[in-house]
Amino acid sequence: QFGNNKAYCQDNIISWLDWTRKEKHKDVFEFFKYMIAFRKRFHIITDSRGKATCSYPPVSIHSNVAWSAKYYDDTRMIGVMYAGVSLKQQGLDEFVYFGVNAYWDYVNVELPDLPEGYHWKLYVNTGNEPQDVILEDRNVILYDRRINMAGRSVIVAVGERY
């Protein structure tokens, strides 16, 4: 690769970025720009500092049932929760949940319970229309920790203090 950003052994149209088409595909560009910024804001995704003060593990795997990592032939989704001590607010924890529905139809998903004083806020839902994928500013709170994920979609939720 010699320092370039191309996919391994794919120096062809599969891995080329045609920046002249950025305006045509502005929604995709804005989505990935948002996700890169999101990753930089939440250090627990890439830089675990150990268990959260609430004793949740740094990374936990979930099926459509929270805290269950049992997978069967008909399991349709996977959830990953990151938990850790906040570097921004001393004494507080951060929680980030990624859910991926690989099935073609809707799947009911239960997110993990959070410590007292936290609730899940939906930041991203790719099952929505393109203009409604990024939800951070819309205050979509999952009070009952459940969401009906659209087929072949991804959600990102953040545990926030209330």
Predicted regions and their residues:
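Carbohydrate-interacting/catalytic domains
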Residues: 1-162
